[in-house]
């Protein structure tokens, strides 16, 4: 019997930075395992990834990216950009296409400029202003498409990202709607917060 898991993660890029948001519910088949899991992982102090798919695969890829970022910094004396990291991850995923990592990842960061990318399990790479992954992504992307503006502030983008994840949580049984993890990355660094809802 195939076990079903799910989540919703979103990313929004503005002129000021990048907002990543995700629900905090971990589910397995029809059971909620926890309501308090982090699905946005920092890779450097300026780049983070969202996780949708196999937890073990995501953790292995995150460790690889952390090591590559440290090696790049040591070798070249400057941080790896989010764009370079997205291309690196795309290559890693594509090299393993016969035994794929079962993940869908959003990379967001601000090193030289705000960058947002979406990667599929085979290494397909799309840079965009907004994106969503996971089982609730059809609901989240509708909210993002309706509310996104190129001139949004980071605060407006944060509110939109939370609304997109929360909307997905109300319609997708595998996405939680009680708490949303939010990471904002700007030229000033990375900030994480959790937005909780009582209802």
Curated annotation (Swiss-Prot):
Kindly list the biological process annotations in GO that this record carries: proteasome-mediated ubiquitin-dependent protein catabolic process
Activity regulation per the record?
The formation of the proteasomal ATPase PAN-20S proteasome complex, via the docking of the C-termini of PAN into the intersubunit pockets in the alpha-rings, triggers opening of the gate for substrate entry. Interconversion between the open-gate and close-gate conformations leads to a dynamic regulation of the 20S proteasome proteolysis activity.
Q: What is its main location?
A: cytoplasm
| Gene3D superfamilies per the UniProt record, alphabetical | Glutamine Phosphoribosylpyrophosphate, subunit 1, domain 1
Write out the annotated subcellular location: Cytoplasm
Which residues carry out catalysis? 7 (nucleophile)
Proregion positions: 1-6
* Keyword set, alphabetical order: Autocatalytic cleavage, Cytoplasm, Hydrolase, Protease, Proteasome, Threonine protease, Zymogen
| EC number(s) reported in the record | 3.4.25.1
GO MF terms held by the record: endopeptidase activity; threonine-type endopeptidase activity
Cellular component, GO annotation: cytosol; proteasome core complex, beta-subunit complex
Catalyzed reactions per annotation: Cleavage of peptide bonds with very broad specificity
- Which superkingdom does the taxonomy of this entry point to? Archaea
Q: Tell me which Pfam families the record gives.
A: Proteasome
Identify the enzyme class. hydrolase
- What functional role does this protein have? Component of the proteasome core, a large protease complex with broad specificity involved in protein degradation.
The record's annotation in HAMAP family points to:
Proteasome_B_A
Q: How does this protein assemble?
A: The 20S proteasome core is composed of 14 alpha and 14 beta subunits that assemble into four stacked heptameric rings, resulting in a barrel-shaped structure. The two inner rings, each composed of seven catalytic beta subunits, are sandwiched by two outer rings, each composed of seven alpha subunits. The catalytic chamber with the active sites is on the inside of the barrel. Has a gated structure, the ends of the cylinder being occluded by the N-termini of the alpha-subunits. Is capped at one or both ends by the proteasome regulatory ATPase, PAN.
UniProt similarity note? Belongs to the peptidase T1B family.
Q: NCBIfam families, per this entry? A: arc_protsome_B
Q: What is this protein called?
A: Proteasome subunit beta 2
Natural source organism: Thermococcus kodakarensis (strain ATCC BAA-918 / JCM 12380 / KOD1)
